[in-house]
């Protein structure tokens, strides 16, 4: 018998990707998948790609999770904390929502609203010392999708003194799956196709998470909705230190990271190369004319930005190689 796994919030995009990864994992046994409005439906009627998984979606209730050794929470922001508080302390929990990412209650109230639920171990294992903290934890907060792409691009450069922590500017495009599966008029194909649209300009909720993890002191972030189902491409710029080689700094930082790839000089990340994988692709240079350091980061928002990273964290928590059940290679075209 494998490690018994429950997925809460299984009807959404991240939940569906979690189910796909768990079902193919050699050490995980999917015992429960729960949902709200879709409870009572057979799993394959909600996620047609999962035909062959003979499960009925259960109501989201702590009692339905009693037999699980490991629980993934793929719920909307603000809904994970109350449920997590009712789970046994020995149950390992990975929260894909934002409820437990931030240390600062003021930042939580300012960007999300409501009561701060407290911080869990932050699940970006490539940060210094973080893999060991995740391994020792029973509660892990999975990073946000944009936050993952930007932190992986920026954190080593600030830590090494290669980039100044002030005056960081980011523009990042994301596929529409990042907005969730709920029906919304502005996400209809007729609205999205052939269009690029910025949103939450200067006020995106991942800003405090990025600053917390990187040490950036000022960050201007413009997210852009792109006409594609999934993927994130982030362009991060900062003031460089004199004579810095940002590609070398990143290559050294991620030399032992199986899911972070610093591309050869002259090649730049693009979203299609990461789709279906748990990898983040990075490239960096210095714009001498503008005096700016530029890093481009690409990943699959549902993979490395959500479900894949959650499985990576779970692997570390239960003592498995972090690569177990995950692919470092994308599917293209």
Curated annotation (Swiss-Prot):
GO BP terms in the entry: L-arginine biosynthetic process
Places the protein is found: Cytoplasm
Keywords noted in UniProt: Amino-acid biosynthesis, Arginine biosynthesis, Cytoplasm, NADP, Oxidoreductase
Superkingdom, taxonomy of origin: Bacteria
Enzyme Commission no: 1.2.1.38
EC class: oxidoreductase
Cellular component annotations (GO), alphabetically ordered: cytoplasm
Pathway annotation: Amino-acid biosynthesis; L-arginine biosynthesis; N(2)-acetyl-L-ornithine from L-glutamate: step 3/4
Reaction equations catalysed: N-acetyl-L-glutamate 5-semialdehyde + phosphate + NADP(+) = N-acetyl-L-glutamyl 5-phosphate + NADPH + H(+)
Pfam families xrefs: Semialdhyde_dh (PF01118), Semialdhyde_dhC_1 (PF22698)
Molecular function terms from GO: N-acetyl-gamma-glutamyl-phosphate reductase activity; NAD binding; NADP+ binding
InterPro entries, A to Z: AGPR_AS, AGPR_type-1, NAD(P)-bd_dom_sf, NAGSA_dehydrogenase, Semialdehyde_DH_NAD-bd
Active site per database record: 145
Alphabetized HAMAP family for the sequence: ArgC_type1
Family to which the UniProt record says this protein belongs: Belongs to the NAGSA dehydrogenase family. Type 1 subfamily.
Function of the protein: Catalyzes the NADPH-dependent reduction of N-acetyl-5-glutamyl phosphate to yield N-acetyl-L-glutamate 5-semialdehyde.
Record-given protein name: N-acetyl-gamma-glutamyl-phosphate reductase
């Amino acid at each position: 018998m494998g490690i018994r796994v429950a997925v809460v919030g299984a009807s959404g995009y991240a939940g569906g990707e979690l189910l796909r990864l768990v079902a193919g994992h050699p050490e995980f046994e999917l015992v429960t998948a729960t949902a709200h409005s879709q409870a009572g439906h057979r799993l394959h009627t909600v996620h047609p790609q999962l035909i062959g998984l003979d499960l009925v979606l259960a109501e989201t209730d702590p009692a339905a999770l009693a037999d699980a050794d490991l629980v993934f929470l793929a719920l909307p922001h603000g809904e994970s904390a109350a449920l997590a508080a009712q789970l046994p302390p020995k149950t390992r929990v990975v929260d894909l929502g934002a409820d437990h990412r931030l240390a600062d209650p003021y930042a939580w109230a300012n960007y999300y609203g409501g009561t701060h639920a407290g911080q869990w171990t932050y699940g970006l294992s490539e940060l210094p010392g973080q893999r060991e903290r995740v391994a020792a934890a029973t509660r892990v907060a999975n990073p946000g999708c944009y936050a993952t792409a930007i932190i992986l691009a920026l954190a080593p450069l600030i830590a090494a003194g290669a980039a100044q922590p002030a005056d960081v500017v980011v523009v990042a495009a994301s596929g529409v799956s990042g907005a969730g599966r709920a029906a919304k008029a502005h996400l209809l194909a007729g609205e999205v196709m052939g269009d690029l649209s910025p949103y939450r300009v200067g006020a995106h909720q991942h800003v405090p998470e990025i600053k917390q993890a990187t040490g950036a002191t000022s960050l201007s972030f413009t997210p852009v909705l792109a006409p594609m189902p999934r993927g994130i491409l982030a362009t991060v710029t900062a003031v460089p230190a004199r004579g810095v080689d940002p590609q070398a700094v990143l290559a050294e930082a991620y030399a032992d990271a199986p899911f972070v790839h610093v591309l050869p000089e002259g090649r730049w990340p693009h979203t299609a190369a990461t789709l279906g994988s748990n990898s983040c692709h990075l490239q960096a240079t210095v714009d001498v004319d503008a005096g700016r350091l530029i890093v481009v980061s690409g990943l699959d928002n549902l993979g490395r930005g959500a479900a894949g990273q959650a499985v990576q964290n779970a692997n570390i928590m239960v003592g498995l190689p972090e690569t177990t059940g995950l692919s470092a290679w994308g599917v293209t075209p």
